[in-house]
């Protein structure tokens, strides 16, 4: 055990998705509450925590490199996060890591920190920790994680093996956290999980309580409650269950943002079956049409995989045909890559890398054209924009159709009389395939 007499300092690196970021925020909040200082430099710290990602091979490599960098610069390293579920893989490369825990193992991480860098006797920082906790996002938006794990067994994914089955947070806890965020100045709440639509399934949608009132543990009830907070509410990772239809009217009424992030993954029924994903493309197209009739302002974001094992040119053409008909607003596309432990690794007819690359290019070319056409329709219109950054040249923000980091931006050239978090009305003057340009009205 170390004998720490100074204010103990912890270095921290957070990798991966927003769900991992929320885990990091929770650990950092606890450390700050206990009196630890969090520092940006490894060589200044008494030890380093690396919160890893292990979803795809490139993420594993990035995590292993971050661990190595921390070991080289500091020497005392605790590893947590998704890759931590594969301890042998980490120890094979970095045997000198002090401790390894899996994802959302907050208590274990803190116990290990206490062992190697004991808690300070006095805690001058306690009163400085904000009620909403330590946040790694800008002050005006925050991620709200509503559950852990996932009950699906998609063949390309290993998340359930790392994060387990679905565990929904009590709805009272979720709503109380949301209220604290809004009280602290947050203007946009981004609801995240592995499967937001499944919220409450594991507890049979039991009734919880918030402010003494009964509230059902479900995505729809959660959206209804969040809409009362008077801030932007954005839904991510929404699996296309039937009850998703019930949140569209809330969007049409302006209660939550008209934005749905639905990872569809493919459009060939045969490939979707191999992926163990729902496979009725015609039904999905009909629902998209119905959603847009109810809520014309709806923005649809999705992600797809090309080059999945067994994908033929015919399967890929079905995907392109789906894109042409669905005309989604925001789309991400990944070339399939094997992930250790994923069922898809055992499938026959692996697609050659050059074919994956060629299909990815065709996919992106088509979607960029669709996206450019969708954004061009906004030129001349007035939209609301939340400001993210301001400098001497102007401001950069996002419309209701744009989530941070993954979607486009709205550029307000010369607009310096605003601050981050302001929501302003903008007339759109120009557009390309991803971004908009405009002036404040």
UniProtKB/Swiss-Prot annotation:
| Pfam families xrefs | Radical_SAM (PF04055), TRAM_2 (PF18693), UPF0004 (PF00919)
Write out the catalysed reaction.
L-aspartate(89)-[ribosomal protein uS12]-hydrogen + (sulfur carrier)-SH + AH2 + 2 S-adenosyl-L-methionine = 3-methylsulfanyl-L-aspartate(89)-[ribosomal protein uS12]-hydrogen + (sulfur carrier)-H + 5'-deoxyadenosine + L-methionine + A + S-adenosyl-L-homocysteine + 2 H(+)
One GO cellular component term, please give it: cytosol
Q: What class of enzyme is it?
A: transferase
Cofactor(s) this protein cannot do without = [4Fe-4S] cluster
> Record-annotated residues binding [4Fe-4S] cluster 2?
150, 154, 157
A GO MF term: 4 iron, 4 sulfur cluster binding
Q: What is this protein called?
A: Ribosomal protein uS12 methylthiotransferase RimO
**The keyword Metal-binding is assigned to this record:** yes
Q: Which InterPro entries match?
A: Elp3/MiaA/NifB-like_rSAM, Methylthiotransferase, Methylthiotransferase_CS, Methylthiotransferase_N, Methylthiotransferase_N_sf, NA-bd_OB-fold, Ribosomal_uS12_MeSTrfase_RimO, rSAM
- MTTase N-terminal domain residues: 8-118
Q: What is its EC number?
A: 2.8.4.4
- Domain TRAM positions: 376-441
Query: Coding gene?
Result: rimO
Q: Which UniProt keywords apply?
A: 4Fe-4S, Cytoplasm, Iron, Iron-sulfur, Metal-binding, S-adenosyl-L-methionine, Transferase
Alphabetical list of SUPFAM superfamilies matching this protein: Radical SAM enzymes (SSF102114)
